[in-house]
Amino acid sequence: MRIGVYICHCGLNIAGVIDVSALEAMANELEDVVLAREVQFLCSDSGQEGIIKDIKDNKLDRVVVAACSPRLHEKTFRHVMEKAGLNPYLMEMVNIREQCSWVHADDPQMATQKAFDLIRMGVAKARFLRELSATNSKASRNVLIIGGGVAGIEAALNLAEAGFPVTMVEKESTIGGKMALMNEVFPTNDCSICVLAPKMTEVQNHPNITLYTYSEVTDISGSVGKFHVRVKRKPRFVLEDKCKGCVDLCSGVCPVEIENPMNYGIGKTRAIYMPIPQSVPQVVLIDPDHCVGCGLCQLACPAEAVDYEQKPEEIEFEAGAIIVSTGYQLFDASRKKEYGFGKYPDVITNMQLERMLNSAGPTGGRVLVPSTGEPPKSVAFIQCVGSRDKTVGNEYCSRVCCMAALKNSQMVKERYPDTDVTIHYIDIRAAGEMYEEYYTRTQEMGVDFIRGKVAEVYSGEDGRPVVRFENTLESSVEEEAHDLVVLSTGYEPTKAAEGIGRMLNLARRPDRFFASAHPKMRPVDAPVSGVFLAGCASGPKEIQVSIAQGSACASKVMQLLGTGELEADPMGAHVDPDKCIGCRTCVEVCKFGKISIENKKAVVDEVSCYGCGDCSAACPVGAIQMRNFENEQILAQVREATAHKSQCPFIVAFLCNWCSYACADLTGMSRIRYPTNIRVIRTMCSARVNPEFVLEALKGGADGVLVAGCRMDECHYIHGNFDAKKRMDILKEVIKEIGLDPKRLRTLWISAAEGERFSNTINEFVKELEEIGPIGSEFKQECAVPGVEEVTQ
């Protein structure tokens, strides 16, 4: 066996902390390593070409790359292996950046020791790597787009024009999202519906797009290439194929008046109504909660489109890929009770002002004080309502509110030049193209800006709202009465997104929006293969960014499904029939139904296997294994880690690829430090962790073992972490029976976005193990640890 080890400097990202030259020297002494080399940037063209040359010149048959996270560049180096004529799965990546140099910059010596331990573990696994080959399977070219806002519309049209069939599902009765309700859009002040309506109509008329409005996705199963989707179409009580959109005939005779849901509590409509004049589709609907069933609209409809007996409709179809563009919802301003929204009629939200400014809105484009019905002489905007606010659980900036307030203040000044307009802000964030100029223009129009937080809004003696605020530039606390107070409410994830997230096992960020696979390198990829994120589904952003992301998602889908075939990941489960005893344990464990019994032996559908490894951990005889994460490969890593115990307490950690390993990466990207006592072994799912791995680690001398996976109900393999928890809970009892402290085994269920929590857990675990004592101290044994200097020199 001839193994090559490559250690990346990554500029100073690694070499600024770790002694890379020492790593090279130590790696050269390892068994089966015929070449170890340090390189400035391994991912560069020259770095990759160097590896290819070395493989050919030195007849290398295995490669270990010590660099950044495999979640970032594993594919890159697998392509390098292919170019060099080797099987791409004969390469192992070792993470010495995100999980070493970036988190241990305060201890270069132990960071170097840890990096060498990780390289040794990588070499140990590399000895057992096998050649793997991918298989191709047919994929549906149909694309599901969840959400018909501007991001979803852009993605749909891009894909449809490229010949892909698209199914768009929108929960509201019209597509267009929030943009369709706005008056104008910054920084160009274009009429919002004027630029959006043609695209909305194009979606409806495009032969490659199937549109389901007033509908919701109720279930998604399957995987990339063959997602099985179930959609529920809610009854409009109006037949879409018959309705002509002549709303005045039916709505005009309706005796029931209701609040128009599109106007955010301002303005009325009838129980049978058209959401907005430019609705797509141009079909009215009946509000079943308020309709009295008088039958007048049915009598008035010349097309006989009204159908009181209409029932919900279930639709099922397959999709090869999914674009999640679920948008956002506005913060409920009534949660900030000190601002009086819902209590004082003249305190409104920015979106209510948008609807007033819209000529098709409830006031015909006039800004009116709700209590008087007259134009205001004084307007105050209060920024960051529900954003940058720990008291409501939203510490993040909603990114758009500042510019939206600037735009609407301009609109007010243009229509009412004599009206005084004031914006109370913490910081004005105007960082986009033409934004600073827009901010300057707003100032030049006479809008006043007061920096400082608003303490409260209360009703003055004359009934006008009074704003009590701090002015940090004047170092004063002041009060001022206004005719109208506008709250710039922040963005939050939609409630509908919660269900979609559960169906697709999508990770969430601390702000509760969906997390992408990598915030810089893969901003529109979800961690789940075949799923992409567009627009505000992944956080607050401007319209132009949402459009760009919609196009980016479409491009990703075209690349994925362009040939109509998918290359199946070979890292699934496989059965050794000579070992299999036909006990059916794996069949019962596999929640995806990918294992069956044929001729008293387990058989895996390897093309559609999800690759979680739950079955492998459950198999009582080791007959079923996970390719690239086989028992002997992982045990080799465990034994190598514990054979060179360089710290006490010493922790072996098994982290799942999707959440806990990604969380450890994020901890590094955030430069959040934790002790060097941990050695990480990556698995695809926490369910892959065989109790044998834990016992082997403790037997080898590890003082503690951490098994970490996704948060409960958020496992990327649905039930994987539940099974892992059951096994580890049982194993703790076994450890206790052996005579060891069961606290030596710790479990952690964490999202990919909880870096602080991950760091805190490691710190707590180290302290707890220090109190318990070294492994075996329960039997009065001492911990023998060679000096760090002895190991690293």
From Swiss-Prot:
Its main location: cytoplasm. [4Fe-4S] cluster 4 binds at C590, C609, C612, C615. It is an enzyme of class 1 (oxidoreductase). It catalyses: coenzyme B + coenzyme M + 2 oxidized [2Fe-2S]-[ferredoxin] = coenzyme M-coenzyme B heterodisulfide + 2 reduced [2Fe-2S]-[ferredoxin] + 2 H(+); coenzyme B + 2 oxidized coenzyme F420-(gamma-L-Glu)(n) + coenzyme M + 2 reduced [2Fe-2S]-[ferredoxin] + 4 H(+) = coenzyme M-coenzyme B heterodisulfide + 2 reduced coenzyme F420-(gamma-L-Glu)(n) + 2 oxidized [2Fe-2S]-[ferredoxin]. Pathway: Cofactor metabolism; coenzyme M-coenzyme B heterodisulfide reduction; coenzyme B and coenzyme M from coenzyme M-coenzyme B heterodisulfide: step 1/1. [4Fe-4S] cluster 1 binds at C243, C246, C250, C301. Its EC number is 1.8.7.3, 1.8.98.4. Residues 233-264, 282-311, 571-600, 601-629 form the 4Fe-4S ferredoxin-type domain. GO terms for molecular function: 2 iron, 2 sulfur cluster binding; 4 iron, 4 sulfur cluster binding; metal ion binding; oxidoreductase activity. Disulfide bonds: none annotated. InterPro entries: 4Fe4S_Fe-S-bd, 4Fe4S_Fe_S_CS, FAD/NAD-bd_sf, FAD/NAD-binding_dom, HdrA-like, MvhD/FlpD. [4Fe-4S] cluster 2 binds at C254, C291, C294, C297. Belongs to the HdrA family. The ferredoxin/F(420)H(2)-dependent CoB-CoM heterodisulfide reductase is composed of three subunits; HdrA2, HdrB2 and HdrC2. Part of a complex that catalyzes the reversible reduction of CoM-S-S-CoB to the thiol-coenzymes H-S-CoM (coenzyme M) and H-S-CoB (coenzyme B). Catalyzes the transfer of electrons from ferredoxin to CoM-S-S-CoB during methanogenesis from acetate. Electrons transfer from ferredoxin to CoM-S-S-CoB via HdrA2, HdrC2 and HdrB2. In addition, the complex can use electron bifurcation to direct electron pairs from reduced coenzyme F420 towards the reduction of both ferredoxin and CoB-CoM heterodisulfide. This activity may take place during Fe(III)-dependent anaerobic methane oxidation. This is Ferredoxin/F(420)H(2)-dependent CoB-CoM heterodisulfide reductase subunit A. It comes from Methanosarcina acetivorans (strain ATCC 35395 / DSM 2834 / JCM 12185 / C2A). The gene is hdrA2.
